[in-house]
C-alpha cells in the first residue's frame, strides 16, 4: 500500500489546545518554583517573572491544574480565601500550605496568556464539591460560592 501526502490540501485544523501543559504540587513545580512569594525574581503576586516569561515564549495554549496524583486529595475550598487549611498530601507525602489555590492559578494563567483547565478531585472529592467549584469559577453573582469569589476580590467570573 502506498500513501501520497498532498501538503496543499488541508482536511481540517488542529486545535492548539492539544498541546497543553500541566503543573502539580510536586517537588518545586509550584512552591519555590513558579510561585515563590518573597523571591527577588517574583512579582507582587508571588509569581516568578522569569518562569512566566518562559511560558509566554513557548506559547503555552492551555495549562492543567491541580494535575497529576495531587488532584485526588485536593479540596479546592481549603485553598481559597483568607483562612486556608494546609493538608497532608498522601500522594507525595508532604504538607501542602494551600497558599496556591484557584485564584492564584487563574491569575497565573492570565499572566501567561493561556486557557485554564481545572481538574477535579474524583479520588476523595464529591460531585457536589465539583459543582461548587464550577459555581465559584463561572457564576456571575448567584449562589454562595460565586459570592465567595466576589468577596475574595474577583468581581467577574473566570470563564
Feature-to-residue mapping (PLM):
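Non-catalytic accessory regions flanking glycosidase/transglycosidase catalytic cores in CAZymes
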Residues: 1-159
Amino acid at each position: 500500500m502506498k500513501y501520497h501526502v498532498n501538503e496543499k490540501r488541508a482536511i481540517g485544523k488542529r486545535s492548539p489546545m492539544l498541546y497543553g501543559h500541566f503543573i502539580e504540587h510536586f517537588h518545586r513545580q509550584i512552591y519555590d518554583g513558579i510561585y515563590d512569594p518573597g523571591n527577588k525574581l517574583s512579582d507582587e503576586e508571588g509569581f516568578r517573572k522569569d518562569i512566566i516569561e518562559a511560558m509566554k515564549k513557548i506559547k503555552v495554549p492551555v495549562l492543567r491544574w491541580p494535575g497529576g496524583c495531587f488532584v485526588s486529595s485536593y479540596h479546592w475550598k481549603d485553598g481559597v480565601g483568607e483562612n486556608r487549611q494546609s493538608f497532608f498530601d498522601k500522594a507525595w507525602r508532604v504538607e501542602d500550605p494551600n497558599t496556591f489555590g484557584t485564584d492564584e492559578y487563574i491569575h497565573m494563567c492570565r499572566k501567561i496568556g493561556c486557557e485554564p483547565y481545572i481538574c477535579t478531585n474524583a479520588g476523595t472529592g464529591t460531585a457536589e464539591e465539583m459543582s461548587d467549584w464550577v459555581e465559584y469559577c463561572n457564576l456571575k453573582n448567584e449562589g454562595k460560592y460565586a459570592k465567595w469569589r466576589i468577596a475574595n476580590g474577583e468581581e467577574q467570573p473566570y470563564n
